[in-house]
Amino acid sequence: FLLITFFCWGSIYIVSKYALAVMGPVTVGMCRYAVSVLCLYGLLKLKGGAKKIQPEHWKYLLILGGLGYFVSIILQLGGTALLSGSLASLINSLNPVVISIMAALFLKEQITWKNVVSIVVSLIGVYIILGKGSMEINMMGVLCSIGSVILWSAASVSIRKISGYYDPVQTALYGMVIALVFNVPAAVIENVFVTRSHPTAVAIGA
């Protein structure tokens, strides 16, 4: 299952490059969540259905859906459009590193020596690629990808406060539904105004 997960996650950046050649990042995100919501809804039904959300927990789901699934993924797609798929994937692989740091700061989770070594190695790897690489790098793409990492990590740490109350499938489904609510009008704006004004623009900063 881990190998399947790695394969699917890695292929996202390759598939996204093709999709972003014909659609803007917001539209790609909308299509992605439309499919995901249908799949997760069916899976949740098979698992027995949804549990009622406690009123005080909605703020965490809004953070997950708004910042995590909506803004963060649009930035990720924007970065993928402006960078090579491998470089975008490399920057976004910093998510576990930033999540560990934020969890230590805000949730008081302990960072082990193993975590420290992993963080240092990851940062050195990214520095070598970004700071010493010979290829030309689009800094707007880098900033989009880094912004995506920060927002996704913040949303991931925030949702941990209620992770023990609900099935992960339900949490993901509700977060994606919230993201889709934002995505639909944003995609309309992107296609009606942005694409019409700049027909060749398919990414942030293009």
What are these regions (language model features)?
Residues 40, 62, 102, 111-131, ...:
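Hydrophobic transmembrane alpha-helices of multi-pass small-molecule transport proteins
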Residues 27-42, 46, 63, 115-121, ...:
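Hydrophobic alpha-helical transmembrane segments of multi-pass integral membrane proteins
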Residues 7-8, 12-13, 41-92, 128, ...:
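Specific transmembrane alpha-helical segments of multi-pass solute transporters/efflux pumps
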Residues 20-28, 73-94, 164-170:
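Structural motif at transmembrane-helix junctions in multi-pass transporters
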